[in-house]
Amino acid sequence: MILDGALQFTGTAGTVSNDSPTTGTQQSTNVIDLVNARDMGIGDDPALKLMVEILTTFTGGTSLQLQLQGAPDSGGSPGSYTTMWDSGAIAEASLLAGRYLANIDLPRTILALPNTGASAAQALPRFLRLQYITVGTHGAGAIYGSIVLDRQDYVAYPAGITISN
């Protein structure tokens, strides 16, 4: 997996740092500026991935919800953010170090097309961020989030195992 400092939601370029959401609603340390409004989820082979991993086990709270949000350009700064993807509430018991909260293809921008029933389109985002919604007060817990080209999530088998073809 190749990490790009310009596509990290957490930390600074050249380091693998983290966010530690504690209570309430908080946003990621970094907002990714795509420079021009675009649909980063379009295309395939390979599609860009949203990867969010727990680095330190969460303690003391009740749950965590993760959202990917996008905002259009508003004169060089973010306009109103809309949620592009939502994890739903994840119970504290599942917030363990090494687990992925998101390991998905980057979602496409939602467009309102005729005869689809969509009432409004999402403006093409120039800015992307993560939002954390926590219930309870977390005493510990750290998250790393980034957009990556490919995931490093191979299945590790124990030594000496034979897989028949």
Task: Locate each region found by the language model.
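Surface-exposed, low-hydrophobicity beta-strand/loop segments enriched in small/polar/acidic residues
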Residues: M1-N165
